[in-house]
C-alpha cells in the first residue's frame, strides 16, 4: 500500500535507455515574441492573437515557442500576476537562450512592449537572427537563415 507521499502510481513503464535514443531530427525552434500588456483589447485578446500567430507558424513548418501562449494560461490558472515582469522575464530566458532566433509579430503595441524590447535586446546581444512577422504571414524564409 502506498502512503501517498511517493506521488501517483506510474501510468506506464519507460522502456529503453535515454542515452540510446536517437535525437529528434529537427530540434531548431524560434522564439515568437508578441505584445501582451500593451495589446488593444487587453491581455486575453493578446493571448488569443499569440496563439493564432503561433499556430500559423507551426502550420507553415516554422517551429516556435510562444511565451504568451505558454505562460498566460499558467498565470490565469495559478492566480499569478500575468503582468509581473519580475516573474515572467526570468522564466522565459532559458527558452530565449535555447532558441535559434527571434520572430517578432508586428501586432498592435509591439513597439511599446517592455517584453518585446527585452527579448529583442537579449537576441541582439547573443548575435541571433531576428525576423519581423506581419500578422498572418509566417516568415517561412527565416527557416533558411
Please report, for each region that a protein language model flagged, where it lies by residue.
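Conserved catalytic or regulatory cores that recognize and/or transform ribose-phosphate-containing ligands
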Residues: 1-145
